[in-house]
Amino acid sequence: MYAIIETGGKQYKVEEGAVLFIEKLADVEGEVVTFDKVLLVSKDGKVTAGAPTVAGATVTGKVEKHGKAKKIIVYKYKAKKNYRRKQGHRQPFTKVVIEKINA
């Protein structure tokens, strides 16, 4: 059984027990989070697609931890003009373990 959910402007294919690194959520570590935007559910070979979401379907997971991704460097310059800017960025994320798919 699997489902496709939408969170943080992205879509993820999830199964029970799967570990996801998603855009940061405001929930506290150890808290149970429910995803209501379920776009597709597959159960025993039967696929149910929503328009745009599957009615009554939810996915629950547990927030494991919050963190920041590896640093990326943003560097811009203009040739021959002595203009250089260097900036780093670390995107915050939330690690979620999927517990149950309710379809």
Swiss-Prot record:
Report the PROSITE patterns cross-referenced here.
RIBOSOMAL_L21
Single GO MF annotation: structural constituent of ribosome
Among SUPFAM superfamilies, the record links this protein to: L21p-like
| Superkingdom of the organism of origin | Bacteria
Keyword set, alphabetical order:
Ribonucleoprotein, Ribosomal protein, RNA-binding, rRNA-binding
Which Pfam family would be a valid example here? Ribosomal_L21p
Sorted alphabetically, the Gene Ontology cellular component annotations on this record are:
cytoplasm; ribonucleoprotein complex; ribosome
Matching InterPro entries: bL21-like, bL21-like_sf, Ribosomal_bL21, Ribosomal_bL21_CS
- In its keyword annotation, does this UniProt entry include Methyltransferase? no
Can the keyword Ribosomal protein be found in this entry's annotation? Answer: yes
Any one of the GO BP annotations:
translation
Q: What biological function has been recorded for the protein in this entry?
A: This protein binds to 23S rRNA in the presence of protein L20.
**UniProt family annotation:** Belongs to the bacterial ribosomal protein bL21 family.
| NCBIfam families associated with the record | L21
Listed under subunit, the entry gives:
Part of the 50S ribosomal subunit. Contacts protein L20.
Q: Which PANTHER family match?
A: 50S RIBOSOMAL PROTEIN L21 (PTHR21349), LARGE RIBOSOMAL SUBUNIT PROTEIN BL21M (PTHR21349:SF0)
Name of the protein in its database record: Large ribosomal subunit protein bL21
Record lineage:
Bacteria, Bacillati, Bacillota, Bacilli, Bacillales
